[in-house]
Amino acid sequence: KIGKWWLLDAWKENPQAHAGVQLAAVPGARSFVTIPGDKIIHPAVIFAVVHGHGGEDGVIQGLADTMHIPIVGSDTIASAVCWDKVITKQMLESYGIKTAPYKVHHLGEPVPNYEELLSQLGSPLFVKPARSGSSIGVSKVESAEELNAAVTLAHEHSNAILIEQALLGRELEVSVLGNPPHHKVSKVGQIIPGEEFY
C-alpha cells in the first residue's frame, strides 16, 4: 500500500523498528536492490501472497514475468482478467458460461432507476466494484435509497461497477495447481459466510 517491502530477516530481528524498504528491479540480473541500502536480493521464486490492488490484479505477476522469475499462482493474464469482473463476465459469456444477470455502471453516469433494475434483474441486487476483491465496496440492495448509497460506495473503489442479480445457492470453490496436462485439482470446498454475504 505504501510502496515498501518488509525483508523477512530484518523484520524477524526487530519487527517494530523495521520500516520497510523500497526495491529497485534489475531485470537482466533477475534481482532487486534495496533502497535505502545496497542489499541485492536474488529470489528463486516469488510467492504472490499480496491481496488487493497491485497483488491480485496482474501487477506483481507482470513484474515476475519481466524479471524472468518463476511465480506461484495465476499468471499475469489470468490475474488481470479475473481481477476485472466486467471482463471476466464478458469472457465467460463468450464461452457460453452463465453468470448472474448484471448491468455495468460507470462513474459519472446517472444512478440507474431502481424500479427498472428490479424489472430487469429482480431483487435483491448486489452492487460491487468491477476491480476489487474480498467483498470490499460490495453492498446488498433492497431499496432505491440503498442503491444510491451502494453505487457511491462501489465507485470509491472502481470507476466501473456491477449491479448484479443476487443468486441464492451454495458457493463452492475449487483450486487448480499447474497447467494441463500436469495440473492438479483440489477437492471442492463450500464457503459458509459468517456474515450476510461473503
Describe the role of every protein-language-model region.
Residues I77-C82, G133, G194-E195:
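Short gly/pro/ser/thr-enriched loop/turn and capping motifs at secondary-structure boundaries
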Residues L92-E93, L118-I136, N159-L168, L172:
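ATP-grasp fold ATP-binding core
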Residues E142-Y198:
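Phosphate-binding site of ATP-dependent enzymes
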Residues M91-T99, L153:
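Basic phosphate/pyrophosphate-binding loop/patch that engages nucleotide-derived ligands
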Residues G52, S135, I191-G194:
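Glycine-rich phosphate/pyrophosphate-binding beta-alpha loops
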Residues K1-I77, V81-W83, I87, S94, ...:
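ATP-binding N-terminal substructure of ATP-dependent carboxylate-amine bond-forming enzymes
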Residues P70, K98, A160:
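Residue-level detector of anion-binding/catalytic polar loops
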Residues A100-V104, L125-T152, E171-E173:
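Glycine-rich phosphate-binding loop of ATP-grasp-fold ATP-dependent ligases
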